[in-house]
Amino acid sequence: MQAICSSEESLYRPEAVRWRQRMEMMKPLGDTVVLLPCSMKKPYSNSKSHQKFRKLTRSFQELIVTSPFGICPRELENTFPIQSYDVSTTGSWSSDEVEESGKLIAKYCEGKNIVANLAGGYLESLEAFVDDFTNVCVDGRPTSNDSLYNLRMELKNHQRVNRREKTLHELRSIARYQFGEDGDRFIADNVKTKGMYHKRILSDGTQIALLNKDYGLYRLNLAGGEILKDLGIHIVNIDFDLQTNTVFAPGIEKADHSILPNDEVVVVRDNTAVGVGRAVMTGREMEECNNGIGVKLKHRLKK
């Protein structure tokens, strides 16, 4: 699915507004944040410009400035809808676009060293809300040899982040985006990943989720559902024994009101995670509806 975002009105599309709201929860890793412009090609890392940037910036916290979504930490670039939207990258921004991105930049980078390689509206959004930063861009061309040289030399003055810490931070950022502010607790210190494309997320050797590269989100296993249950996140309570992979709304006693359609949820009975799957309704609708499917299960506890 591709999200078409080609005008200023796109700022107020529900998916763009929801993304910016979730970006307010995100936290950077390390002492330095490197700000980069977005690219037409998605995910950004596949673009020629970002391949040049990444040779210099991959060991730092990277933050991509974009509209209408505001900002995108590098670790979320594969996440829907940011990985599939279509938008002009001319660099000419409206005042509303400058404001929406600028506010998020200021909040995300608070207390951090900021190294920017920006021009045009991207730079305007930074200048409007942040006073202390270093911009290495020359002649409005972030990919020029001079700009890249300046970026390389400036980053020599800043501390890189540890690879293991970076991996954990990436996994926790995705969990925070998907499950809310406490979501990063879904990823324990001992978590390991296996797989080149879709990544299996393992805790103590047990798979808790699959990180789906196509959407950049976790697909839960039952063990992961048990973790979510203990965290009190995305819970759907039922009062019957599961016999199929479909949970109908009339059998749902209570549901987390933060749940939206297509969210990953854990189905709980008698304080035990008995199933995990995808929400079809909002949590409130699950409680109020007298018919219809509430959850489609991917895994369930079988006796």
Which residues does each PLM region occupy?
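Beta-strand/loop-dominated core regions that host nucleotide or nucleotide-derived cofactor-binding catalytic loops
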Residues: 205-303
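Peripheral docking tails and interdomain loops at the edges
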Residues: 3, 121-166
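Structural motif
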Residues: 36-40, 116-122
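A short, acidic, amphipathic alpha-helical segment used as a generic capping/interface helix at domain edges
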Residues: 90-112, 250-254
